[in-house]
Amino acid sequence: MYRIGIDLGGTNTAAGLVDDSLKIIDKISVPTVLPTDPDSLTDGMAMLVRQLLSRNQLSAKEIHCIGVGVPCTANEENGCMEDAAHLGFESGAFLEPLRKKTGIPVFFGNDANAAALGEYSTGGYDQDSLIMVTLGTGIGGGIILNGKLWSGINYAAAEFGHMTIRNDGVPCICGRRGCFETYGSGYALIRRTRECMETDRDSLLWQLCGGNPDKVEAKTLFDGAKAGDTAALQILDGYTTDLADGLANIINIFQPAVLCIGGGISKAGDILLQPLRKKTALRICTKNAKRNTQIILARADNDAGIIGAALLGN
């Protein structure tokens, strides 16, 4: 039997046909059109499912289930997507409409939770606890305890991006101030970079973005830091300090064996990881213990979200 995993992202929606060994046999990725509504969303996903079945000469009866990772709260009790402002609506029915449109059992979960499950299942871990923090447009997360995904009583656990790290800090889309993602997300890093560039017209960052701040990406900052640009190094220092504050909070609460950094920002590699490890180590309560949480970059590739989504039906 096969499974289909769908990773609904803010930029792209990817659907993959997954076999019993968790290998992706075929994959389709299309741009995510936002804002949207629940009916249009399930129509698009049903179309992706039909395309995968057709391309691989399979029938719906040969698919064990469809699993979907969504960037909002996935209420398993009523089958609705909730708190879905990023998608253009507040809430809406999801599981039953998609099941009717495909004829296949459907399961869903938060996208970062699904990525954590995919990472844990394919990354070769021998520990029974792992926390994943995804650094992308925002900050998400997933919690693996005793080898199982933990999503909380309201299916909204691991919203690490919305813990406060600065009182009266930068306003967040959630309505609060000083949330972790307003300082540690990819969007926050780009904001910091643009602000710093305006005060340092000689920075290499101007050259790296072609003189247009609107073209600044996270990669712009990391490339500047690797080249030794003073402004870029200052931005990176402040960014990793704020990241370390948030990660230390998570470690102090959960004490996981592994804390895994995923998402687009993690692709920066050691220039991000090394200062992050050092600064976090200074902030945790057990800094003198013989055994502490390993902070690593995600081992699985960008397909972890698809594989994790496919496993939501377990």
What are these model-derived regions, one by one?
Residues 156-159:
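Structural signature of FAD isoalloxazine-binding scaffolds in flavoprotein oxidoreductases
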Residues 109-123:
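Conserved PLP phosphate-binding loop immediately N-terminal to the Schiff-base lysine helix
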Residues 11-12, 112-114, 137-140, 167:
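Conserved A3 ("GATE") glycine/threonine-rich loop of ANL adenylate-forming enzymes
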Residues 28-30, 85, 153:
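Short hydrophobic alpha-helix segments
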Residues 79-90:
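A charged helix-plus-loop insertion that forms the helical arch/lid used to bind
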Residues 1-65, 75-78, 95-104, 121-127, ...:
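ATP-binding/phosphotransfer module of carbohydrate and carboxylate kinases, centering on a glycine-rich
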Residues 7, 67-71, 109, 131-138, ...:
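Short beta-strand segments
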